[in-house]
Amino acid sequence: MMWKALLIAVLAIAHCQAVLETDANTLVLLDNLAIRETHSIFFKSLQDRGFKLTYKLADDSSLLLSKYGEYLYKNVIIFAPSVEEFGGDVSVERLAQFVDDGGNVLVAGSEKSGDALREFASECGFELDEENAAVIDHLHYDVSDAGEHTTILTSAKNLIQADTIVGKANRQADAAPLLYRGTGLIADKENPLVLKLLTAESTAYSYNPEASVSDYPHAVGRGTLLIAALQARNNARVVFSGSLLFFSDESFTTAVQYAQSGVFHKLAGNRDVAESISKWVFGETGRLRVASVQHHKEGELLPPDQAYTITDPVVYTIGIEELVQGEWRAFKASDIQLEFVRIDPFVRTYLKQTNTGAYQAKFKIPDVYGVYQFKVDYNRVGYTHLYSTTQVSVRPLEHTQYERFIPSAFPYYTSAFSMMIGVFVFSFVFLHFKDEPVGRAAKEDKKSQ
């Protein structure tokens, strides 16, 4: 029985290793080491999923992101709101380059966010509100609030409609509200890559709670972002939260109650949402890849040696996989399209999933020769951008491949044959019809008289 229990434990541990080995190394930058204790539940959840965390102070002079041209970490967590300047090899420019090279970053700020976080936020398409500005909601605040109405509660319905990022269960109507205390974020409206993960209630605004409101707030109502994300074109991911409290043990374990309505919840929904967001930003969920691509004529198994011929019936098959619990499994979707492109798409059709899990489409090549591409461009919120192209040539028919009689030319055939028949009839009549001389006919008439 002991060996069975040991086997079950080993399997359970292996199942918990949801992260790939190559993505496990994570650098955690902190304002002070006390944050490691106040956010221990969040960090432990990462370690339980297989992440290898390296804790450093954000201004440590020995910080290194890369060594000998290779990055030491795949992910970076910045829980250092007040840092004015990073230490060592880390800087805003290096972090931006880290993202450009495919790295993932999770950042949590506060009302007193330093210049370093503000500069990095602007690089990612976000803007932190002014220093000392906090999100205020006079109608949706927690009973634990000190009187400034900055410890707010926001409904789970304000989460983005993307189950891959925030989890399907966390968006249910009966889900617990989310506890938040921090500054507001403003998204760049011209940046199509920015995702609004969590917004405030319509009654909220971001302003300095110790000052009277003399100017219109920078962020008001649903335009006040609490958590925002960026998925770059290279599929690197960045999540920015205006609240460090959101990921703390306090928000994970404390009961919450609306001060106005008195509605009580045993726990806030922060823990489940924070874990779902961390899974997404570090690539544990929402990752797709192309496993295989095949194309050939219908009835054959291999592609042609040189080129397809116009009007050939072809079969295109692509295998798409999704990372689930650290394993690549067949991806299931009903909205994946294939385009057969020569400058513009000549064919656009849906791919249907086969019994093997791959996606397949059958169509006839257009009656236009040239250089084409089989193109799959799948871009959905929460998933990595899937892009696959395969170039093929399409040639015209050889002279021995044309039909003897082309149906579309039947009118011309009829015209030609009718002309031939008409000429023949005319020639026959012209050659065999003979008129009698007029003088001879008159003499015969006189004789008869």
Swiss-Prot record:
Residues 434-449 are cytoplasmic. Keywords: Endoplasmic reticulum, Membrane, Signal, Transmembrane, Transmembrane helix. Pfam families: OST48_MD (PF23358), OST48_N (PF03345). The chain crosses the membrane at residues 413-433. Pathway: Protein modification; protein glycosylation. Residues 19-412 are lumenal. Residues 1-18 form the signal peptide. It is found in: Endoplasmic reticulum membrane. One of its GO terms (biological process) is protein N-linked glycosylation via asparagine. InterPro entries: DDOST_48_kDa_subunit, OST48_MD, OST48_N. GO terms for cellular component: endomembrane system; oligosaccharyltransferase complex. It is a single-pass type I membrane protein. Its main location: endoplasmic reticulum. Subunit of the oligosaccharyl transferase (OST) complex that catalyzes the initial transfer of a defined glycan (Glc(3)Man(9)GlcNAc(2) in eukaryotes) from the lipid carrier dolichol-pyrophosphate to an asparagine residue within an Asn-X-Ser/Thr consensus motif in nascent polypeptide chains, the first step in protein N-glycosylation. N-glycosylation occurs cotranslationally and the complex associates with the Sec61 complex at the channel-forming translocon complex that mediates protein translocation across the endoplasmic reticulum (ER). All subunits are required for a maximal enzyme activity. Belongs to the DDOST 48 kDa subunit family. PANTHER family: DOLICHYL-DIPHOSPHOOLIGOSACCHARIDE--PROTEIN GLYCOSYLTRANSFERASE 48 KDA SUBUNIT (PTHR10830:SF0). Component of the oligosaccharyltransferase (OST) complex. This is Dolichyl-diphosphooligosaccharide--protein glycosyltransferase 48 kDa subunit.
